[in-house]
């Protein structure tokens, strides 16, 4: 079976969806599928080896100029291809991850319009490549925001199965101003109804998005979230190492952005540090920081300083895989108390794989993650005091921390490897996987 997996580059930032797409593409290959991971917009950036193709369709510079400069469509094709070179795209879009979604309303609608949009020539180029050179049996879309090409693909490759993954489309849509948001939601719903299947990692999140986009919830296909467990096979959790007792260390690993809820954790940490027995509790947080959120980070650091806790918390930047493993190896607890409905929770599975128990809000994909893995506690969402209560319970109970960490790690390492998701995907597409 030949599969083309269309993934969306994130302008040089470490992107959870990109990294998971890369891991899934590798696993699909190991299971016997001829899978091509094809980037759109920009090259993808991962924290391990990438299998993505080197050329890019819908290059970020090209689609922007096609949308904003009508005469650009008359520029010779060979010059446009120069703008799609990976090195140039990486340089030209190095700050694009800081672009506010509310400034992209027209471009979003144009991209979703496919052949009727300003990027029609890019639609034609991609579809011709799929039809004439690749001839795939199935095409996977990393989200429905990139699915404006579906009607053209349906016409030119009627036998190909089209599968989209719902994994964070809402986070982008929520930042679009009205009426762009409503129009985009309507169009995404139309495109979703033309897919053979919609994959979700969480039933709760999937049903919420189906209602929002007007999709039939019965057509959702649940493929539980997985990670590449290879980096964690020889990992020794802190709770199992012979280390002297020290301060309990709480960790956060996600984008530094309001929707990921760092402010909730900072407020909970300040609350927690005023409680008996928490005089030495520390907080380490890390994740990609866009220019538009530097003020947000400064606000959180200022809160810590005003509370007299500046020396007990640290921002560790955006580490690579080795740095992430080193950070997880020093943690006793983990929390990403998102403000939005989290569709995945990759960093949660990574923390559990490292034997670190989690304390999470009961919203989005988190209830299913915690209940299925048994590796943590759920608390009321958007409530820093409730989060502090959950953290305090485990700060004061090291035996429960060890037990939850052990249970969570065992579940992830035995049942949440990306190979299982690849097998389910292949079976859904009608092919027999190599392993069972």
Where are these regions (language model features)?
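A conserved catalytic-core segment of Leloir-type glycosyltransferases
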Residues: 37-125
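Carbohydrate-associated surface elements
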Residues: 204, 226
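Glycosyltransferase donor-sugar binding loop
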Residues: 282-299
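Short hydrophobic beta-strand element within catalytic cores of glycosyltransferases
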Residues: 357-360
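Conserved acidic donor-binding segment of nucleotide-sugar-dependent glycosyltransferases
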Residues: 372-373, 377-384, 393-398
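A short, well-ordered alpha-helix in the C-terminal region of glycosyltransferases
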Residues: 386, 393, 400-414, 421-424
């Amino acid at each position: 079976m030949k599969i083309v997996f269309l993934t969306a580059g994130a302008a040089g930032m470490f992107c959870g969806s990109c990294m998971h797409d890369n891991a899934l593409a590798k696993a699909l290959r190991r299971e016997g599928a001829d899978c091509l991971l094809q980037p759109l917009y920009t090259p993808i950036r991962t924290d391990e080896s990438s299998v993505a193709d080197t050329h890019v369709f819908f290059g970020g510079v090209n689609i922007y100029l096609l949308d904003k400069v009508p005469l650009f469509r008359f520029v010779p094709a060979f010059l446009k291809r120069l703008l799609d070179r990976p090195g140039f795209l990486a340089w030209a879009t190095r700050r694009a991850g800081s672009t506010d979604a509310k400034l992209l309303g027209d471009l979003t609608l144009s991209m979703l319009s496919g052949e009727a949009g300003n990027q029609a020539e890019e639609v034609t180029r991609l579809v011709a490549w799929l039809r004439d050179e690749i001839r795939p049996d199935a095409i996977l879309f990393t989200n429905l925001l990139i699915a404006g090409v579906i009607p053209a693909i349906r016409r030119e490759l009627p036998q190909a199965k089209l599968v989209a993954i719902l994994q964070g489309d809402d986070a982008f849509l929520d930042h679009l101003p009205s009426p762009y948001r409503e129009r985009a939601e309507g169009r995404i719903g139309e495109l979703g109804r033309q897919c053979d299947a919609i994959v979700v990692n969480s039933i709760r999140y999937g049903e919420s998005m189906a209602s929002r986009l007007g999709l039939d919830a019965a057509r959702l296909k649940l493929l539980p979230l997985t990670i590449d467990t290879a980096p964690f096979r020889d990992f020794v959790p802190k709770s199992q190492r012979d280390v002297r007792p020290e301060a309990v260390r709480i960790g956060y690993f996600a984008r530094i952005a309001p929707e990921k809820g760092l402010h909730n954790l900072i407020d909970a940490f300040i609350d927690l540090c005023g409680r008996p027995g928490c005089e030495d509790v520390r907080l380490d947080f890390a994740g990609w920081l866009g220019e538009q959120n530097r003020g947000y980070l400064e606000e959180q650091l200022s809160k810590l300083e005003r509370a007299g806790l500046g020396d007990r918390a640290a921002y560790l930047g955006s580490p690579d895989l080795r740095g992430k493993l080193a950070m997880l190896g020093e943690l006793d607890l983990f929390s990403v108390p998102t403000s939005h409905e989290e569709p995945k929770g990759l960093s949660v599975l990574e923390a559990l794989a490292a034997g670190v128990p989690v304390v999470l809000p009961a919203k989005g994909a988190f209830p299913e993650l915690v209940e299925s893995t048994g590796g943590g506690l759920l608390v009321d969402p958007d409530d820093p005091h409730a989060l502090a209560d959950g953290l305090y319970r485990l700060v004061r109970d090291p035996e429960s921390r060890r037990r939850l960490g052990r249970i969570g790690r065992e579940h992830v390492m035995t049942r949440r490897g990306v190979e299982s998701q690849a097998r389910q995907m292949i079976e859904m597409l009608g092919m027999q996987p190599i392993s069972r």
